[in-house]
């Protein structure tokens, strides 16, 4: 139960930080335009109607399609969140759900996701992203690492035979 509370806090915190960071970035951009923060990082304004890296953004009804896809993914993640028995996995899913909700809120309010962080080195420019994207990416990576570690730990030899593995129940 405690992990669920921490997971819900993660959802709310990530969602709130994402929305605040976007509001701040929108305000900053409207007053100052694109701004270099570091040699490799700039504050920009990109309205992303597609998915990752702006893919499929030119589709006529992309916002509607991706809104429904986002809702489906969030609902699926929430079911997994509720069913999860692993504290760390619950927190990872909370971070992912919070980020996904942040981007969904943009789609519902603006018809596109607001991206404002641009990383670049010389002529190389990574597609713009936002705090929610970072949280979704980090949450998924942490969740996958936990799953790999859990499954590696769950396989144990019970017979002395190196080819005989069984699943250890925790």
From Swiss-Prot:
Residue ranges of the TM segments? 5-25, 62-82, 89-111, 126-146
Q: Its annotated pathway?
A: Protein modification; lipoprotein biosynthesis (signal peptide cleavage)
The alphabetical list of record keywords is: Aspartyl protease, Cell inner membrane, Cell membrane, Hydrolase, Membrane, Protease, Transmembrane, Transmembrane helix
Which Enzyme Commission numbers does its entry carry? 3.4.23.36
Give the record's GO CC terms. Answer: plasma membrane
Compartments, as annotated in UniProt: Cell inner membrane
Catalytic reaction(s) noted = Release of signal peptides from bacterial membrane prolipoproteins. Hydrolyzes -Xaa-Yaa-Zaa-|-(S,diacylglyceryl)Cys-, in which Xaa is hydrophobic (preferably Leu), and Yaa (Ala or Ser) and Zaa (Gly or Ala) have small, neutral side chains
Q: Which InterPro entries match?
A: Peptidase_A8
The parts of the chain that form a coiled coil are none
**Keyword flag Cell inner membrane:** yes
Bilayer topology term: Multi-pass membrane protein
- One example of a Gene Ontology biological process annotation: proteolysis
- Residues of the active site are 115, 133
Q: Which family does it belong to?
A: Belongs to the peptidase A8 family.
Reported function: This protein specifically catalyzes the removal of signal peptides from prolipoproteins.
Q: What is this protein called?
A: Lipoprotein signal peptidase
Species assigned in the record: Anaplasma marginale (strain Florida)
- Native organism taxonomy: Bacteria, Pseudomonadati, Pseudomonadota, Alphaproteobacteria, Rickettsiales
Gene responsible for this protein: lspA
